[in-house]
């Protein structure tokens, strides 16, 4: 019975340790994400009044927060002997961000003054901010879930729901123009980054607590006033003066913060107004171009319609002329049929004569083929000049007579 009770006690202790560990991990993740949100806001506010560089405390704090977020529950590198050596988040970024177009991974790997992995990771943060691609790098790395699981343990920020919040928070930094020197002391990878929580810590006293404090002061002042003399009236007045001074200081701080926010909002409003005016002017230009193109299209359409109508009229006139010429030729043929037959007979006789002359073998050597008009003309000229003699004709000399 005692052994069972001891076993139950040990089991409850194990469950309590697990729940405590889960709570601590959740609190750690929530703290880092909250501080990251505050650091991004302060960085955006500060960028409205001055250029952000390595000397800016807001940037140094943001870089420390981001470095700790990316190093949260990062697995060690297993050596040949089975031991785990600590590694930097740069080893994860170098593998997971290879798919980013025009990435700066190779250029950071080839930097001469940066040797350690931690220094390369810090250089990557600065280069990504100057390129305005830090959110894109983080989003691409988080989408590669297989690589992320290989580098981080369970309970890491990059494996939880806070990862999507991180990518969304970093998107606002694309509006800031950063200026960093990649040879400064900020790239020293000897010591880990430390977060300064003091700018984000603010104690707010509840209204009940304030009223109870005022009641205590009143009771304390009334008890002292009963047996007080003119000599011991000083301390309550001093306390009252200090309280008014603190209130005035708090009001001044609130006024200064409100003034800075007002300046930031005015600058943002001016930027949006400029963008709106540019968009309106571009819209007017585009509308004018659309109207001009519509007018040109209408004119072109009217011209094409006029050309089509004119071509149709010409086609109709040509068709009527062809029909009229056909009717005229038919009427001429019906009025003079003998002339056409006589012409046909003459043509047939000429063809017959040409064929007969062509069959004579004695003329082929002299005049060639009589199928052409030129050969026929040469033959007729020879006949007229008596150049062709008959084979029965005798050649006699005029001076010789038969005896």
Curated annotation (Swiss-Prot):
Residues 53-185 form the RUN domain. Pfam families: RUN (PF02759). Residues 1-20, 207-232 are annotated as: Disordered. Keywords: Coiled coil, Methylation, Phosphoprotein. InterPro entries: Run_dom, Run_dom_sf, RUN_RUNDC3B, RUNDC3A_B. SMART domains: RUN. Residues 220-231 have a biased composition (Polar residues). PANTHER family: RUN DOMAIN-CONTAINING 3 PROTEIN RUNDC3 (PTHR46251), RUN DOMAIN-CONTAINING PROTEIN 3B (PTHR46251:SF1). Belongs to the RUNDC3 family. This is RUN domain-containing protein 3B.
